[in-house]
Swiss-Prot record:
Gene knockout outcome: Morphants show reduced movement and have abnormal neuromuscular junction morphology compared to wild-type animals.
Chief location category: mitochondrion
Name by which UniProt lists this protein: Transcription elongation factor, mitochondrial
Originating species: Danio rerio (Zebrafish)
UniProt superkingdom: Eukaryota
Keyword hit for Transit peptide: yes
Transit peptide: 1-23
Length: 363
């Protein structure tokens, strides 16, 4: 059944009268015929009684109006600034623009290489993952790079990615953090500084996890052993899992993760003076997934491919997104292949969480 937008002013008769045929004057009043607009097949070519919907007089007008929509939102000078940035910036420079981190910056560079420089703002939405609304935000960010930072100075909104609430200035002053991710049988952590240089990166097996009756003393012994190797850092960032309590099949896993999370907070938190920020923070797992475009619906996919690219860029590029020491690249270069996914998934997530923390603070 066709979904018809608008009202057909003519009367459709059964028999030999077609949809666009005028009935005899004696039978019905003289109504003006109007074109049908089909919302589900606007770009397709459909014929009705010698009427070509793809070449109708209204379609080119609509296409022309849409083609001018983005470009007409900006002055000639603003369009020149935006196109200059998009046509000349490197991948790492594009990642500094809001919404262009990860795959979007890669797609822009690939599109330029294949099709040449962008000739109009409208052509930008041909890039995969960039649609009308996101393109507007990208353009505004290029024209006003400091606006958002000035507006959001103060506290980071709880709903975004950090809990508990912390003054943004304290987070921005952090010289290094330790990102911690817990799995069903191991704990992984990454030590990273403000320049996104990986200082250390490890994981440890925990023999008591998900065993028997979840004996608290065994959990405490394993977790204490892991954190005893942590270096000094300004903040400890613990991943907040996104398992729903309604998913009863994963209830044992959720209890395990919450138990480890509570012990990490207790063991890593120190007595602090009134007004000083907490040192142990939660970071939403979903926020990290959205930052790296790893979400499929409500589920987060593996970030192994993203991490492998970061490690490669650290060796090949002069200004990489993340700087890995040479010994860590050699040590972990084969840890994130498909055949060893379960071996290094927690390490992968810990590293990505640290990168997302510093990059989100720059927005």
């Amino acid at each position: 059944m066709w979904i018809v937008k608008g009202i057909l002013s003519s009367v459709v008769l059964k028999g030999h009268y077609s949809l666009f045929s005028r009935p005899p004057p004696s039978s019905l009043p003289d109504y003006a015929l109007r074109f049908l607009h089909f919302t589900c097949c606007r770009s397709s070519k459909i014929m009705f009684s010698e009427f070509d919907s793809s070449n109708a007089s209204i379609s080119p007008e609509l296409r022309q109006e849409n083609a001018k929509a983005l470009d007409s939102c900006y002055t000639e000078e603003q369009r020149a600034v935006i196109l200059q940035r998009l046509n000349t910036a490197t991948e790492s420079e594009l990642e500094q623009v809001k919404l262009l981190r990860g795959r979007k910056s890669v797609n822009i560079v690939k599109y330029r290489t294949r099709h040449g420089p962008f000739s109009s703002l409208e052509s930008v939405i041909n890039v995969p993952l960039l649609k009308y609304k996101s393109a507007i935000m990208v353009f505004d960010s290029i024209l006003n790079p400091d606006n958002k930072r000035k507006r959001n100075k103060g506290k980071v909104h709880l709903a975004k990615f950090i809990k508990p609430d912390v003054n943004r200035a304290h987070l921005e002053d952090a010289s290094s953090i330790i990102s911690i991710v817990c799995g069903t049988n191991k704990i992984a952590w990454a030590h990273m500084d403000r320049a996104r240089t990986v200082l250390d990166w490890q994981q440890a097996e925990c023999q008591s996890f998900m065993k028997g009756t979840y004996l608290a003393s065994d959990y405490l012994e394993d977790i204490s052993s892991v954190i005893s190797s942590f270096p000094a850092a300004d903040f400890f960032l613990v991943e907040k899992p996104s398992i729903s309590p309604q998913n009863t099949s994963l209830f044992p896993v959720m209890v395990h993760l919450r138990t480890v999370e509570a012990m990490l907070f207790a063991l890593l938190s120190q007595a602090r003076e009134p007004g000083s920020p907490p040192k142990v923070l939660n970071m939403m797992r979903i926020s990290v997934g959205r930052h790296f475009d790893l979400m499929v619906g409500d589920c987060r996919t593996s970030g192994a491919e993203t991490l492998r690219k970061m490690m490669t860029d650290s060796v090949m590029k002069r200004d990489p997104r993340v700087l890995f020491p040479h010994d860590l690249v050699l040590k972990h270069r084969n840890s994130f292949q498909m055949s060893s996914r379960n071996k290094g998934e927690e390490m992968c997530d810990a590293l990505l969480q640290a990168v997302a923390f510093f990059e989100l603070l720059q927005e």
